[in-house]
């Protein structure tokens, strides 16, 4: 099955000049969604990561399922003040400013190999921030599905 048939391009959303990729049709089809998870998990497994990181909210559509499929820990990456314990945070650029992404301080250990999962790529800022967070904690980035993007080439 061609998964791209379940991802719809929506022009000028959320603003003029932006092509938004709507993945809800993919998630409405259990067979297509399962295939997408299986294909991503297969690629990520080749990098032999110890943990999967994904950012809220749309990264949570894929990251936890991939982690379960590979029997790996899932590290939720949240915005500032959303995690209850001590955190490691990294500032990242948005189209309209900056924000902070955080993980619990003990979520990633020195020497861990991490895989970074996100749903889409706009500027690459979210994925880059997740990679930097892992590196601050002493981990090595072993996989990001966005590896072809110029912003991230130096991280993998």
What positions do the PLM features span?
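Active-site-facing substrate-recognition patch
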Residues: 1-48
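Short glycine-rich phosphate-binding loop at a beta-alpha junction
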Residues: 49-56
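Short Gly/Thr/Asp-enriched flexible loops that form oxyanion-binding sites at enzyme active sites
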Residues: 61-70
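Short, glycine/charge-rich flexible loops or terminal/linker lids adjacent to PRPP-binding catalytic cores
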Residues: 72-114
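Conserved G/P- and acidic residue-centered "switch" motifs that form tight phosphate/ATP-binding loops
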Residues: 119, 124
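Active-site/ligand-binding-proximal alpha/beta "capping" segment
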Residues: 125-136
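Conserved small/polar residues in nucleotide/adenosyl-binding loops
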Residues: 144-151
């Amino acid at each position: 099955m061609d998964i791209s048939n379940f991802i719809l391009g929506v022009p000028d959303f959320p603003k003029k000049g932006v092509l938004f990729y709507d993945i809800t049709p993919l998630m409405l089809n259990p067979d297509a969604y399962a295939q997408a998870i299986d294909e991503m998990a297969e690629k990520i497994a080749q990098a032999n990561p110890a943990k999967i990181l994904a950012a809220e909210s749309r990264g949570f559509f894929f990251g936890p399922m991939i982690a379960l499929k590979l029997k790996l820990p899932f590290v939720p990456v949240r915005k500032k003040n959303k995690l209850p314990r001590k955190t490691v945070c990294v500032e990242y650029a948005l189209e309209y400013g900056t924000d902070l992404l955080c993980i619990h301080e003990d979520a990633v250990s020195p020497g861990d190999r991490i895989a970074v999962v996100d749903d889409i790529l706009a500027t690459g800022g979210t994925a880059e921030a997740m990679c930097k967070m892992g590196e601050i904690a002493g981990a090595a980035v072993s996989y990001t599905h966005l590896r072809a993007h110029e912003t991230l080439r130096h991280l993998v």
